[in-house]
Amino acid sequence: MKILEKIKIIEQSDKTRVEREIKILKMLRHNNIIQIYQIIQTRSNLYLIMEYANGGELFDYIVLKKRLPEPEAVKFFQQIINGVEYLHKLNIVHRDLKPENLLLDHNKNIKIVDFGLSNLYGRGELLKTPCGSPCYAAPEMITGKKYSGLMVDVWSSGVILFAMVCGYLPFDDSNNDILYRKIAAGDYKIPNFISDKARDLIKRILNTDPTKRYNIQQIKNHPWFNINAPSINEGLLIHLYTIPVKFE
């Protein structure tokens, strides 16, 4: 359950963001995306009743295991990409993909959560608002350029892939200026214990040039992605509609 305090939703921009998040959640029907069941309103709070994922965050799972064996990482990555592809088919960009926003259910299947920074976009539309977590942000976003929401989600998925198989982040620094310079330059090293196929896929996703970065279909066609036969779930495409939310 997600609880939103109405007293903290004061500005019109905040109201718009919450309405958009709820509207997006109501559209989604996919095995690898968290399901919203009900919205309960009181005078002070909004309660979003969500699907229960009792396996915790992927972040904690990676920390517990130090790093994931590649066959297990492939399974998780397939599910992440399947979920992201479904979002993009609905013209939704997540913009805050990271292991903390990926939950595991009782069968250790991925559930993408937290659509607070998500947005809807038109075909070919470029976005301009920088958002998300710095370590997972794409170079074009942190340098203030207009960006393709699809490609920033792909970049973030590549950072997640690196974190799963390596056990640490490709770009990390306590000083954000230094961190951003590393991201913009694509300054990272892949350890020797990573397989050649995984290494190749990581390099193709973490390309600082979004026009040369692998897209979803190229990722799905890559040999590493297909080490284990992926279980494809297309999800349901539901038409967008407005969910009334009152903040008075």
Model-derived segments and spans:
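Conserved N-lobe beta3->alphaC-helix segment of eukaryotic protein kinase catalytic domains
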Residues: 3-28
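Conserved short submotifs of the Hanks-type protein kinase catalytic core
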Residues: 44-57, 61
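Structural helix C-cap motif within protein kinase domains
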Residues: 166-169
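Activation segment signature within eukaryotic-like protein kinase domains
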Residues: 76-77
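A short, aromatic-enriched beta-strand patch in the conserved N-lobe beta-sheet
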Residues: 38-39
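C-terminal regulatory tails of eukaryotic serine/threonine kinases
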Residues: 211, 216-248
